[in-house]
């Protein structure tokens, strides 16, 4: 009896079973309910795995809802006032999720185009490669990207990477409303059947165009399971070296972008400690507007609801808690694909159909031809070396002039060299000719030449390397000509002061007697330009990328 009471107590503690939202309905009930569950169009839609674009073509027929016995499946939608809706025969395990959306911004940070493509493909929940020959074997020091390598967001990042050195910060908000998957052996769409019928039985160079035409229409894969809802995803491209010159890091800016996004959706108050810390950082760095207005090289994606990607709910003009709430309220009736599982198209064909293997080969060939290769044998610029952790990354020795990302730590930095000194018509002694030497000054440094004895027209072959200097604030470049006597009583014959500018310059200065000519060259450090190297200069990729093996390069 005690054991019975114990088990009964456990049973009473268990949560009540949730009734299944779907049931088998009679023909008359099926006719009375005309609306499908939201988002049925997503099931069985074609997808090109290299672009992650949905094809708007459907290899699977999701319009059929009556079974052969004239029954159907109807579902009670708790997110739409328990309305009764049809479920297509091709769909199984349909479930609505909670009616509320958690207001939380997830942030990811990557430093390469490959990383952006990898994050874009992270919404695929299964191994899309299964059954395909798509495992590239690159040479040493070559990185390969396949899934998402030609997606809009990856193309955006690649374009940026060819312009400058970037870090990429992504802020994302997701809401899941429904989930379902395809039934086993779903019915094929009549148009897809017709397209398959027109395919040649074998895949080779002469039939490739026919298979490419089908892939162009339907994609490489089809959606087999899906989470529906909404997503707002904003990728901000941050110029690494420009941030360094502003006294900031990509992590600092990314953290404050996330805080501003949290405030815009009502997930965090503008009186929070994090928000106040970012406001203080803005004051320190003289940022007059918000971080998202200051750093606004962005790619925006809005899925679900009545909005499109021109409506940035995190950083745009409509970025308010009220607009975000309105968008959430629209998702039960207008959901979009948040994440999904994929299978290659060829598995829809019967095992005995020879076109199944031909289509498998065609998809494999197409996907591999679209792979993007990054050749990490590309040389680093002078003064840089390959990172021990990533052979595709060039790094520098951390110093008071540059950081490990090879970014100058402040504006105005240049490498200064002075050489080719020639004096004429000097007069330093009454009896003999001049015993001349030079003193050259800049930025607190002094460099001397040796003495040229008994010569009123001396020249010096010294190459004076002042190293990295602050061109704008180092003071004048000063060249003094002296006549050597006993050291303590040497005579100053004249001084030449010039405010140095970037570039190659020949200088001719008059002295008390005669003149002095010399050359100086001031080369702005990488990422800097202008007369005194105060302006920012983007640094694109060095040279043309090497040819790739089977697809495009980054």
UniProtKB/Swiss-Prot annotation:
Residues annotated as binding Ca(2+) 4: 485, 489, 491
Cross-referenced InterPro entries: C2_dom, C2_domain_sf, MACPF, MACPF_CS, Perforin-1_C2, Perforin-1_pore-forming
Residues annotated as binding Ca(2+) 5: 485, 488, 490
EGF-like domain sequence ranges: 375-407
Principal subcellular localization: other
Signal peptide range in chain numbering: 1-20
A Gene Ontology BP annotation from the UniProt entry: protein homooligomerization
Disulfide bonds: 22-75, 30-72, 101-175, 241-407, 376-392, 380-394, 396-406, 496-509, 524-533
Domain annotation C2: ranges: 395-513
Post-translational modification (record): N-glycosylated.
Residues the entry annotates as binding Ca(2+) 3: 429, 435, 483-485
Binding, Ca(2+) 2: 429, 432, 435, 454
Membrane topology: Multi-pass membrane protein
GO CC list: cytolytic granule; cytoplasmic vesicle; endosome lumen; extracellular space; immunological synapse; membrane; plasma membrane
Important for oligomerization, annotated site positions: 213, 343
Residues bearing attached sugar chains per UniProt: 204, 400, 548
Cellular compartment(s): Cytolytic granule; Secreted; Cell membrane; Endosome lumen
Pfam families: C2, MACPF
Record: residues binding Ca(2+) 1: 428-429, 483, 485, 491
PANTHER family reported in the protein's UniProt record: PERFORIN-1
Family in the record: Belongs to the complement C6/C7/C8/C9 family.
Description of how the protein assembles with itself and partners: Monomer, as soluble protein. Homooligomer; homooligomerizes to form a pore-forming ring.
Recorded domain comment: Perforin consists of three domains: (1) the MACPF domain, which includes the central machinery of pore formation, (2) the EGF-like domain, which forms a 'shelf-like' assembly connecting the MACPF and C2 domains, and (3) the C2 domain, which mediates calcium-dependent binding to lipid membranes.
Function, as annotated: Pore-forming protein that plays a key role in granzyme-mediated programmed cell death, and in defense against virus-infected or neoplastic cells. Can insert into the membrane of target cells in its calcium-bound form, oligomerize and form large pores. Promotes cytolysis and apoptosis of target cells by mediating the passage and uptake of cytotoxic granzymes. Facilitates the delivery of cationic cargo protein, while anionic or neural proteins are not delivered efficiently. Perforin pores allow the release of mature caspase-7 (CASP7) into the extracellular milieu.
Full protein name: Perforin-1
Organism: Rattus norvegicus
Taxonomic path: Eukaryota, Metazoa, Chordata, Craniata, Vertebrata
Encoding gene (name): Prf1
